[in-house]
Amino acid sequence: MEVLNTGGGDSIDRCPTQRPMRVLVLASGGKDSSYATWWSTLRGWDVAGLVTVRVTGEDSMMFQVPSTALAGMQAASADLPWLPIPIEGDDRTEMRILEEALEGIVHGSHKSRSPIWSSAELLDAAWPEGWVWPSNLRRLRASEPIDALVVGAIRSDYQKTRIEQMCERLGVKSFTPLWHHEGRSHMHDLVSQGHQVILTSVSTEGLGKEWLGRILSQHDVEELESLAEVHRFNIDGEGGEFETAVIDAPWMKYSINTQHTVHWTGRRGWIDIWGAELV
């Protein structure tokens, strides 16, 4: 592999044939994986598909839990294949399950398989009732070998280290383009570049019910910045202060229209997305 410097502190690998890097993006449907996908396309890489961990339990230390089926909508919007991987959120087994699923993809295969979903695969996708299944949503299959996995991790050493160790075992590169990015500039960049970000949950003092389901504008980011300073929380939500979903982005061809119900306990809240379709 030849290493090329991007001039921005990152190094990018290309194969000796100079073909574009062929990558998968670990996508949750949220803001950081949306940025990671956009970052990959800007480098001219071949994004072979989106991979989403679908947590069936109530929590996970590694992966986002709510609204991750939106990554399937995003994949269809960009005409990319999707690989949903169901896990229970047990930290003793979740990385092993992810690795086993990727092992069947990253090394490629000369066998041609239909991208049509089997009944078992549809069950694994855990598609929410009431969401319109995109007719063009293809299931990711092994074809050409994968060179790297791109992840939207920002400051979680726990997540980054485990992903890097897994990628080393799989024999692929790991890229974290957002690693240690400054939160304020990251949030402003997302909005200015055309990522339509909504807050799907809030759980910190200073963020009330009115933030739930809101599409963030530059003014909203400035307000978030002020609130974060007063209430001492992370403006990018990296401390678990809020979760996000992206309903449109520069790498997507269609927007996602959602219908939701707001739930508020008085101290925290979330939205239940009961309807979604591409428009």
Stretch-by-stretch model annotation:
Residues 98, 223-224, 273:
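Generic hydrophobic, helix-prone segments enriched in Leu/Val/Ile
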Residues 69, 93, 160, 184, ...:
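A generic structural micro-environment signature
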Residues 2-199:
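ATP-dependent adenylation/nucleotidyltransferase module used to activate substrates
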Residues 46, 118, 128, 132-134, ...:
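Short linear interaction motif-like sites in intrinsically disordered regions of transcription factors
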Residues 199-256:
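A conserved mid-domain beta-alpha-beta active-site/ligand-binding segment of alpha/beta enzyme cores
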Residues 180-189, 206-220, 261-275:
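Short flexible/disordered coil segments
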Residues 16, 73, 235-238, 264:
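Sterically constrained small-residue positions within well-ordered secondary structures
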Residues 241-279:
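Long hydrophobic alpha-helical segments typical of transmembrane helices together
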